[in-house]
Swiss-Prot record:
Pathway: Amino-acid biosynthesis; L-histidine biosynthesis; L-histidine from 5-phospho-alpha-D-ribose 1-diphosphate: step 5/9
Catalyzed chemical reaction(s): 5-[(5-phospho-1-deoxy-D-ribulos-1-ylimino)methylamino]-1-(5-phospho-beta-D-ribosyl)imidazole-4-carboxamide + L-glutamine = D-erythro-1-(imidazol-4-yl)glycerol 3-phosphate + 5-amino-1-(5-phospho-beta-D-ribosyl)imidazole-4-carboxamide + L-glutamate + H(+)
A cellular component term, taken from the record's GO annotations: cytoplasm
Lineage: Bacteria, Pseudomonadati, Spirochaetota, Spirochaetia, Leptospirales
Localization: Cytoplasm
Family: Belongs to the HisA/HisF family.
Official protein name in the record: Putative imidazole glycerol phosphate synthase subunit HisF
Active site: 130
Gene name, Swiss-Prot/TrEMBL: hisF
Record PANTHER family: IMIDAZOLE GLYCEROL PHOSPHATE SYNTHASE HISHF, IMIDAZOLE GLYCEROL PHOSPHATE SYNTHASE SUBUNIT HISF/H IGP SYNTHASE SUBUNIT HISF/H
Organism whose genome encodes this protein: Leptospira interrogans
Length: 254
């Protein structure tokens, strides 16, 4: 059995590296290219880059930035943000990006996902599901365009439909836990895991390596992703790019 991948997630806004709390309160923390270089040195398993400004503002992907990131990156790279069609996805993969990540597309134009899976291979297509608990119903609901638009769709339903349309991987992203570093919602994630028939990666909530270990041991998933955990250090959240060394990473699996 393959060991789960430990995946840093970097958020990009207008070309700069930022961090958010519950998809808001953007804080500029540096240059994404510099962060990639550091994760190269630390031999990260994989890297995810999400352009939140492209997602929120409906802009096309920043191809120049993506190409520079791909050229710099020495590990498998996934990219999401602003991808609306097969041509854009194909161009991004041509830079050396391993997987493209789409979110809003799964609701607004899911047939494009089927085309991507057919022509690019479903292993290259990840559907990200951004969800949070609504104040009125206290039920989980999917939000799109970087959390700015309600859909009325449950994450469970979207997960099933995304797989039907050809997604080769699901990225579950908790808006409520984004940047708060208080752990994952294990009970909710277990429900997702029970109905997910493709590889599943989880993002949102990690505040310690123990949180990663709990997720791996409880869910048996292929990928554990985190943002704040790998860019902050200490209770005052000083910016310091970090990643577990080989010994600490091995301890997560046993």
């Amino acid at each position: 059995m393959l060991k789960p991948r430990i995946i840093p997630t970097l958020l990009v806004q207008h070309g700069g590296l930022v961090k958010t709390i519950k998809f808001s309160n953007q804080r500029y923390i540096g240059d994404p290219l510099n962060a990639v270089r550091i994760f190269n040195e630390k031999e990260a398993d994989e890297l995810t880059v999400l352009d939140i400004s492209a997602s929120r503002e409906g802009k096309a992907p920043d191809y120049r930035l993506i190409e520079r990131l791909a050229n710099e990156c020495r590990m498998p790279l996934s990219y999401g943000g602003g991808i609306k069609n097969l041509e854009q996805a194909s161009r991004i993969l041509s830079f050396g990006v391993e997987k493209i990540i789409v979110s809003s597309l799964a609701i607004e134009n899911p047939k494009v996902i089927s085309s991507m899976a057919t022509y690019l291979g479903n292993q290259s297509v990840v559907v990200a599901i951004d969800f949070k608990k609504t104040l009125l119903t206290r039920r989980y609901e999917v939000f799109i365009h970087n959390g700015t638009k309600k859909t009325g769709i449950s994450p469970e339903d979207l997960l099933k439909h995304a797989i039907e349309f050809g997604a080769g991987e699901i990225l579950l992203n908790s808006i409520d836990r984004d940047g708060v570093m208080e752990g994952y919602d294990l009970e909710m994630l277990k429900k997702f895991r029970s109905i997910c028939t493709v590889p599943m990666t989880v993002l949102g909530g990690a505040g310690s390596l123990q949180d990663l270990k709990s997720l791996i041991q409880n869910l048996g998933i292929v990928g554990v992703s985190a943002g704040s955990l790998f860019v902050y250090k200490g209770i005052h959240k000083a910016v310091l790019i970090n990643y577990p060394n080989r010994e600490d990473k091995e301890a997560l699996f046993y």
